[in-house]
Amino acid sequence: DFGDAVVDLNEGNILKNFQYAFSTGASIDSNEITGRIILAETGKTDSTLFAVLYNKQEDSTVAKQKPMYVARVDGQGNFRFTNLPSGAFYVYGLGDVDGNKQYNQPIEQFAFLDSPIVVSTTTPSVQLYAYAAEKEKPKASSSASGDKARGLLVTPNLEAGALDLLDSFRLRYTKPIRKFDPSKTRLVIDSAETVNNVIFLNDSTRNQLIVIAPWKAGNKYRLFLDKEYATDSSGLTSIKNDTISFRVKTEKEYGTVRIRFSALDTAAHPVLIVYSGSDEIIGRYPLTGKEFYRSMFKPGNYKLALLYDTNQNGVWDPGDYFSKPKRQPELVQPLSNPLLVKENWDNELVIDMNAPPKKQ
């Protein structure tokens, strides 16, 4: 399989998927395997993946030996092996990060079938679901959280100076906070009254301070931060007084959402996943019935999907090829119905689960 390696001499046009077959015997093998690889976590496809074939299965084979056959995956997730001999083959999908066509990094996408495929002239198409056993760790940021001239920098999670009623008020820092003095802070409502019983909590990364207070919708607040109220892990501290002014949104700035599902299999433990326009997960909602309702939902355009949550922990879980028994990944099904939420509006959507699946 030459892939895209063959081009014409004058224009450089690619001769796509060119294959050259030859035989050392009197005939050429004519069997084939076709299939598709889908990313289990998103339901999408990835044209950088490969499908690979082995004629034996031991847990270490895919990590230590080169495959017998390799096929590229196209933009629809499809692959095809041609000119195969008769016999049994083990089919895998691989996101080959290091270029060695072996599965030896847990951050690589990987897919496997539970049993071998017996190749003949009528071999059925196969479906594989790829997963990464571990997430790729983000690279450490080389940027500092400030400098000695400016001091410690803080970024509140406000939208145009407003606090989301459905979110916590958070103060974000680029480095973990090592020292914090709440006595050097003061929260004021409507420019006059001091708010008592304000609690500051460090999140698990210590890069955020969560501010807990009895917020009142529609009111204006100011958070006063005196100098040296906080110090990060590099020893950088706030060198001057700071004030964060904001308001809390009102309920009218949200919409209600009602989604009705037809033919939804609740026995499969579906979880509704809501994505922002940039594919960031903004909510996961286990579905115990065929209707989802929220009295307050942030306005915007959203994408939807269903996670079939086998172990009922509320999040997607990858597979495990090396466990006993092997475990396939949980599956996510993208839904073709977009969700548009308008402010101060009853937003309704009906989703037919019997409708044709979304094209990738």
What are these regions (language model features)?
Residues 1-360:
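N-terminal targeting or signal-anchor segments and their processing/structural boundaries
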